[in-house]
Regions:
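Helix-biased detector of long, well-ordered alpha-helical tracts
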Residues: 1-325
């Protein structure tokens, strides 16, 4: 029997292999959620790391400052999904020999600016030689309560903190050269080159959300992950498609639903809220400067469907996946 290669397995099978190798852990959250949590003398110490690789995560149009910014935002977004404010961050950077020193400084500046944007600092790190640029960020924070992926119950309201399809359309514009309307271009490109994390919204939602995940791998995949972890299904009654993404799809003969459901690189939060907490949660998010968009409901039937033109259609469990996408 031939050994399976990483390129054949894909990122999610690699994660499954890691979980199998490590086994069950004693921490409150098992491996596979958005963050790790350990008991540090009665304090919930929250840890997060995520990696950015030039060949898969950095479009040619992305400037060094934006690379550093994105590397931090990717991590903050997962902390936001758990309702945790980062306290500090460190960077580990692999740098090719022909990378310019000035660009390196700009990258570090971008990472530092992003950290300060979300209320913490980069306090150290490591550098090494590498064949291509690799930036790994690790964040730490503390929390009394973590919003898991596994808390959704039938009847809970499914909601997001924003509209979808912008980053997916933006990537097609940048990488494939598909045309965008002049008035829409910034709305499409900005989420790709300078994404934002919904930290204020995540902190506001923490007392109310029963389950939460960030949407960096796509809306459909995020909903399926919540369904799998919580043992429920979902009925998506309203797919939150950004108007600029819908126009881009129309102009380029693309499916707006595919852009919204199956794209990646979007950093919205996908949450479930018990019905009795909906008004308070929506008010808290609004007071934090954000918005909470109701998109569906958790169901006892363990499948994910969307209502499209008055009929239910299956939502496939797919999204962005390293090695396979």
């Amino acid at each position: 029997m031939l050994a399976m290669l990483a390129s054949e397995a894909g990122e999610r099978k690699l994660i499954e292999a890691a979980v199998e190798a490590i086994g069950r852990i004693s921490a409150p959250l098992q491996i596979g959620d958005d963050v790790a949590v350990v008991d540090a003398g009665g304090i919930g110490l929250v840890l997060k790391t995520d990696m950015l690789v030039a060949s898969t995560d950095v479009p040619p149009q992305m400037a060094p400052w934006q690379v550093g910014w994105k590397a931090v935002v990717m991590n903050v977004s997962d902390m936001a999904a758990k309702g945790v404010k980062p306290a500090a961050g460190v960077l580990a950077i692999g740098v090719p020999g022909d990378y310019r020193l000035e660009d390196f400084k700009l990258l570090i500046k971008g990472a530092s600016d992003a950290a300060r944007e979300y209320g913490f600092e980069i306090v150290g790190g490591d550098t090494n030689a590498c064949r291509e640029l690799v930036v790994a960020v690790a964040l730490a924070g503390v929390a009394k309560r973590i919003v898991p992926r596994s808390g959704a119950k039938p009847g809970d309201i499914l909601a997001t903190t924003g509209y979808f399809g912008l980053a997916s359309a933006g990537l097609k514009h940048l990488l494939e050269g598909l045309p965008a309307r002049p008035g829409d271009r910034e709305a499409l490109v900005k989420p790709v080159l300078e994404p934002k994390a919904r930290l204020r919204e995540g902190l506001a939602l923490a007392p109310y959300a029963s389950a939460s995940i960030d949407s960096s791998d796509g809306l459909a995949w995020s909903v399926h992950e919540l369904a799998k972890a919580s043992g429920v299904g979902f009925r998506i009654e309203h797919i939150p498609i950004a108007p600029e993404a819908a126009s881009f799809a129309e102009d380029n003969s693309l499916s707006p639903l595919d852009l919204a459901l199956y794209g990646g690189e979007e950093y919205e939060l996908v949450v479930t809220i018990p019905p009795e907490s909906w008004s308070a949660a929506a008010k808290a998010v609004e007071e934090a400067g954000g918005r909470l968009i109701r998109v569906g409901v958790a169901t006892r039937e363990k499948h994910v469907v969307a209502v499209v033109d008055g009929r239910e259609v299956e939502v496939e469990p797919r999204g962005y996946e390293h090695f396979l996408t």
